[in-house]
Amino acid sequence: VTYGRGGSSERQLRLLPGEIAHITRTVRRAPEVMIKISGGGQSAKAVAAHFGYIGRQEFEIETDHGQHITGTDAQRGVIADWDLDLDAAESRSPYRGASGRKPTKLVHNIVLSMPKGTPAVGVLEASRAFAREEFAFQHRYALVLHTDQPHPHVHLVVKAMSEQGRRLNIRKQTLRDWRRKFASCLRAQGIAANATERAVRGVTNPQKSNGIYRAMRAGRSTHMRERAESVAAAMQAGNLRVEAGKSRMVDTRREVIRHWSGIQQLLRSNGQEQLANEVERFVAGMPAVQTERDWFALALTDRTRDVRRERSLAPTR
């Protein structure tokens, strides 16, 4: 069951226990796990800089061999142990560069995160289990828990080339599989966790790149300012057009609702009335499909209305 996209749940006669559990977590809005690729060094120097960032002074890095290391010298030891200089030399070979492609990544920098309030120790244990199950005896890795922000998160550095000489290629399906695995590892620690696609949950607001997101948090995003100014100008001119991608988003939402309706009917046919009702409320509560431009237009409209109200209430002189 895909809970909204590309599946044939409505043609099944009975849902499996694991599928029912996933549906239940989704409609009851269990915390969603987050896995993102934050980059990856193309040189041993870049990898060392990243280790310096995630290790800092107060954080302890844990290797795939169970070592706990701190300090620059220890981090350099990990890089030497992983033979990254050899990998870097190979990626710069004339045969590799003949196609004009950039040097390949020596490592993948991965972030495993959970919302504020999640026990940090549980996130660390789940991250250890995830890394062990996905990479042990294949790809060298190291991880470190960060608790300097409200949401506990683990930085996981994975060597791109395996011990068997196979390169780790991370695709969209890889990330979906990893999210499900990480959520399972968290639940094994007694932590409520779910891994469902954004569209299936009715989430349509576009995700921001790491750089834009950090700039937004710091209040210095030129991208967001330029987008807001563009929407404001279009609204003033009276020619705010519908974005080309919105029709695809609307089509996706229709497909999501169609499959959720099939699941709802299947639950009722199997006597799962309470869960079917929860599915119905979940779908009814999905926010309207909204592009980034829609979001800006609504925010600007609300702000204009607030300003006018404040002016009307201001005492006259």
Question: What do these predicted regions represent?
Answer:
Residues V1-R317:
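N-terminal nicking endonuclease/strand-transfer module with a His-rich metal-binding environment
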